[in-house]
């Protein structure tokens, strides 16, 4: 964000004109096969998954250092890998290590709270579905080690989280306390 003489401008990724995207695409779980992780927070939940940006996000409880994988083929457009700390306070909101990947249908996936030096890809890299891209952590606004991830489409007001199908299961089925297993 750039502020000039009381005017504020913001730059967002993607084409805000995107109307259709592949709503039936079956995304892979963001972790290795034969692993299972507990859902800490599902869509539209009280703590941080409210509003347009995070409504359909899912948090998986993952100890620091667990392998995070791409949920779909795409191109890495943003990486943050320098932060070491995390906490509940909003002052940590912009201090999360993350990866954002662009998909061919105009959507994006965001993988957040990665550990410092835990990113295996760089901006501009092409990635394949199931490819390891980083390691889970506890950076940014986070109360415990986990992976926060969501799928987005661009809008005139920035990225908006969208419902999606993950491992043949719609996002609304990923409820707090349930487990997701990657077979």
Model-inferred region functions:
Residues 68, 74-76, 121-136:
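A structural signal for short beta-strand/turn segments enriched in small hydrophobics and glycine
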Residues 1-96:
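Surface-exposed, glycine-biased beta-strand/turn segments
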Residues 79-94, 131-147:
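Flexible, gly/ser-rich surface segments that form the specificity/activation loops bordering the active-site cleft
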Residues 27, 89, 120, 125-128, ...:
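Acidic, glycine-rich catalytic/binding loops that coordinate metals and/or anionic ligands
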Residues 106-130:
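Short histidine-centered loop motifs in beta-beta connectors
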Residues 94-96, 101-107:
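OB-fold (S1/OB) nucleic-acid-binding surfaces
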Residues 110-115, 143-152:
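Histidine-centered catalytic micro-motifs
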Residues 41, 78, 113-116, 138, ...:
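A residue-level detector for short acidic-glycine micro-motifs
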């Amino acid at each position: 964000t750039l502020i000039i003489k009381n005017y504020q401008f913001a730059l967002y990724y993607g084409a805000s004109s995107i109307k259709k995207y592949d709503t039936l695409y079956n995304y892979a779980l963001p972790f290795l096969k034969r692993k299972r992780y507990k859902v800490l927070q599902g869509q539209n939940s009280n703590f941080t998954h409210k509003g347009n940006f995070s409504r359909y996000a899912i948090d998986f409880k993952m100890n620091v250092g667990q392998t995070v994988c791409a949920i779909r083929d795409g191109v890495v457009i943003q990486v943050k890998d320098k932060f070491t700390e995390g906490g509940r306070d909003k002052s940590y909101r912009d201090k999360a290590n993350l990866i954002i990947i662009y998909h061919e249908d105009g959507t994006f996936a965001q993988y957040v709270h990665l550990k410092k030096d835990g990113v295996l890809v760089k901006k501009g890299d092409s990635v394949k579905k199931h490819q390891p891209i980083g390691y889970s952590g506890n950076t940014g606004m986070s109360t415990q080690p986990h992976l926060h991830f969501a799928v987005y489409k661009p809008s005139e007001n920035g990225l908006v989280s969208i419902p999606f199908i993950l491992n043949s299961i719609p996002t609304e089925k990923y409820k707090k306390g349930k487990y997701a297993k990657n077979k």
